Amino acid sequence: MNKVILYCRPGFEKECAAEITDKAARYNVYGFVRVKDNSGYVVFECYQHEDADRLIKELPFQELVFARQMMVCGELLRDLPPEDRITPIVGMLTGVLERAGELRVEVPDTNESKELMKFCRKFTVPLRAALRENRILLAQEKASRPVIHVLFIAPGCCYVGYSYSNNNSPFYMGIPRLKFPADAPSRSTLKLEEAFHVFVPADEWDERLGSGMFAVDLGACPGGWTYQLVKRSMMVHAVDNGMMAPSLMDTGQVIHHQADGFRFEPPRNNIYWLVCDMVEKPAKVTNRMADWLVNGWCREVIFNLKLPMKKRYEEVTQNLALLAQRLEENGINFEIHAKHLYHDREEITVHARRIWGAIPGRRDER
């Protein structure tokens, strides 16, 4: 198996291809990319046979911005016989994988492929049984073992492969299944909820998303992102010249500042989270987020960058480099991650965290 498949949002195949080519080269892995517009996936074919497995082990999945999932696979299985689709799939995995912990029969995130979803659900049951019988799949799901992926791109045509559970997306099709809350002021609320799932490990939610924290939401109206903070029992400074949803103001947890989000400064030095979903040039937003982190006005930020129509990958890399440069110049320890979330459209979501600790010449404890 010498191919790496990456799932992505339809329409962003070129950005996904540019990113995997760039980042694979950093690990001395070289190959070529097969891209089909609006297909929802990209195939990176490695020149060296063993490089595909090495790449999905060594390239941290969380460093990929445009990929929803990353797996190794072999050649496309075409024209699977309707009377026996299982045998070729089992044959593809025999001798390659043993004792996998989970099976996912998936499709790309396109309207055409979604017509195959019903078939995939039904097909999973007999395929799972056959894989267990051949000892390719464990009798019980095990989160620490590799995941088998069967990606149907058309009726009777699929890629078969695997990912490592410690370096993949834990979600089916790479998409968190979130339900829109009926009382939320706008659908944008799902962007921040998804960001929390992607950027903050579940076992750290109590510490980093706990009740009683203070947060700032720049460009808050009508309150989609503020809603997520309020739901987690935080106190929120909502900054926007527009009006906030009365339902949020009635909670008593929101202070509304009718001000410019790019000029607002926190009234007290007790802010943990800064979130921002303002429509503005990416560099302007990035610099303002850097200001907050450099000045110690917050510990963690989540913000959106609206992308141009062309050279979107270049725009992303430039802004992430700008943010890192600003923090490095000020001697700050930090983590930065970015993702093109399922609920993002022509934008990406960035998370940056200031690592507070003992730095010579500074007092970083609070």
Curated annotation (Swiss-Prot):
Q: Which GO terms describe its cellular component?
A: cytoplasm
**Where is this protein primarily located?**
cytoplasm
Q: Which residues cross the membrane?
A: none
Cite the binding residues for S-adenosyl-L-methionine: 188, 221-224, 240, 260, 277
- GO BP, sorted A to Z: methylation; rRNA processing
Name the keywords, alphabetized.
Cytoplasm, Methyltransferase, rRNA processing, S-adenosyl-L-methionine, Transferase
GO MF annotations, alphabetized: S-adenosylmethionine-dependent methyltransferase activity
Q: What is its EC number?
A: 2.1.1.186
What residues form the catalytic site here? Answer: 306
PANTHER family for this protein: RIBOSOMAL RNA LARGE SUBUNIT METHYLTRANSFERASE M, RIBOSOMAL RNA METHYLTRANSFERASE FTSJ DOMAIN-CONTAINING PROTEIN
Q: Which family does it belong to?
A: Belongs to the class I-like SAM-binding methyltransferase superfamily. RNA methyltransferase RlmE family. RlmM subfamily.
Q: What is this protein called?
A: Ribosomal RNA large subunit methyltransferase M
Naturally occurring in which organism (per UniProt)? Dickeya chrysanthemi (strain Ech1591)
